[in-house]
């Protein structure tokens, strides 16, 4: 038997949705699409940083940022 405490009574509303799951896949496919797009974004940033993605007429050195 669980012991009832004042803190537990205060926190109970935060746990009222425990075990309730929406039927089906929900928004999982949408989340997968955004994760894939984010992975592609990170790969592009990494390739630009490593200079393995060649960009014509775009200088990616730190000197180009100075005035």
Swiss-Prot record:
Primary location class: membrane
GO biological process: photosynthesis; protein stabilization
Keywords tagged on the record: Membrane, Photosynthesis, Photosystem II, Thylakoid, Transmembrane, Transmembrane helix
Any one of the GO CC terms: plasma membrane-derived thylakoid membrane
MF annotations from Gene Ontology: phosphate ion binding
Keyword Transmembrane helix among UniProt keywords: yes
Transmembrane segments: 29-49
Membrane topology: Single-pass membrane protein
Pfam hit, one: PsbH
Annotated localization: Cellular thylakoid membrane
Superkingdom per UniProt: Bacteria
Biological role stated in the UniProt entry: One of the components of the core complex of photosystem II (PSII), required for its stability and/or assembly. PSII is a light-driven water:plastoquinone oxidoreductase that uses light energy to abstract electrons from H(2)O, generating O(2) and a proton gradient subsequently used for ATP formation. It consists of a core antenna complex that captures photons, and an electron transfer chain that converts photonic excitation into a charge separation.
Record's subunit section: PSII is composed of 1 copy each of membrane proteins PsbA, PsbB, PsbC, PsbD, PsbE, PsbF, PsbH, PsbI, PsbJ, PsbK, PsbL, PsbM, PsbT, PsbX, PsbY, PsbZ, Psb30/Ycf12, peripheral proteins PsbO, CyanoQ (PsbQ), PsbU, PsbV and a large number of cofactors. It forms dimeric complexes.
Record family assignment: Belongs to the PsbH family.
NCBIfam families listed in its UniProt record: PRK02624.1
Protein name as it appears in the record: Photosystem II reaction center protein H
Source organism: Synechococcus sp. (strain JA-2-3B'a(2-13)) (Cyanobacteria bacterium Yellowstone B-Prime)
Gene this chain is encoded by: psbH
